[in-house]
């Protein structure tokens, strides 16, 4: 399937972005949407060229593990990901206060395996010239390998990956060192108002749900982590029943199937991780975290939909993405940037985004401002959002962001790494091909009513949880229209 891509438009975007960056401390000229947009008219005259979407091949290993393989012959490179549907949200299923165990397990997976201690393992990676990493999110723990596809190199790289999966070292002295380093890092984070705001926001938003805690855990819980905790997490969750495998690069399908089967054979069997419960909606409130800073860091938002998995969900996601780009996308033509930064000078940047997760995501707007202006900045932000919801975004705003999204989407297919990342996301969440190859059509077919309806359905200002971190607690009793609980 092919879609149209304008190279000139990409050049224009790069030029505009570069100019904006170079002049970020100067007044940026906002587009007047009450007048015709010459740049949009000129684009109609630009000759467009074709690009080809990659073909995602789906199969399962002999043991039933889902695989997405994308054959790309341009580079002698192979990317492989093994992702497990069990991240830090499952920490408490190992031990009630074992918060951070998924993150630490991922950390230790690259610190020795089989007969290789940490130093030998790192030397083997360096000798092969490969990237072999592991990391955890709230929903998943993932391992990624990038290697040349030369037979000897790829064979040895796969052998190292299989040792990670089947014979992780989990050395006690290494664990103590990594705990010490993480605790030092967490102590530094305690001085970061953005970190404090994110932690307080997630705790208030998700309450007693497993999503309420940060993936790293906290200082006290990290101190308690033991090798037994790490092994228990690995044995319970890093199993074939929780796994998906994604392979991208210069291989035949037969080679990809062979590799997937080798990886699958390295995984123990067990009981598939249960689906997490849905979180309970939190009451709108203002939470202030005292912090010695002249700036106040602010997050405001609420629960939002989980990962989109159906065509109807994809439409809603696209429509809201367009609306949010116009309202809170972070560019100088986004309404919040224009009003809160350019006109009022409250902040250097303000940005809103949807964070989708397996059972419930969240929408949040983040910025910082001078402590004395915090109340006014929050009040002005709320006013801009209320106006967008009441009156909608304008047709010329939609045209601008629709063109932006149309010409940005092919960047998802611009490199092996970006294609692999997209395929990995699709594999983790069980998304059909239409998720990727239908986006341009969804953008082009989006009407102004569609986009404004998605905006109204997604952003609910009366449900906002507002977190402020700074010296002085702003009085927000008159900001929200509903009863506001101050803490």
Where in the sequence are the language-model features?
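Short, polar/flexible loop-turn hinges at active-site or ligand-entry regions and domain interfaces
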Residues: 112-115, 165-173
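M16 family metallopeptidases and their MPP-like homologs
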Residues: 70, 75-107, 118-165, 183, ...
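Short proline/glycine- and acidic-rich turn/helix-capping motifs at secondary-structure junctions
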Residues: 179-180, 275-285, 396-406
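Gram-negative bacterial Sec-dependent N-terminal signal peptides
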Residues: 1-21
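Histidine-acidic residue clusters that define the catalytic metal-binding segment
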Residues: 33-35, 39-57, 203-243, 273-277, ...
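Short, glycine-/polar-rich solvent-exposed loops and beta-turns at beta-strand/coil boundaries
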Residues: 135-139, 175, 280
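His/Glu-rich zincin catalytic helix
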Residues: 23-123, 144, 231-339, 465-487
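A common structural junction motif
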Residues: 161-170, 263-271, 383-393, 482-487
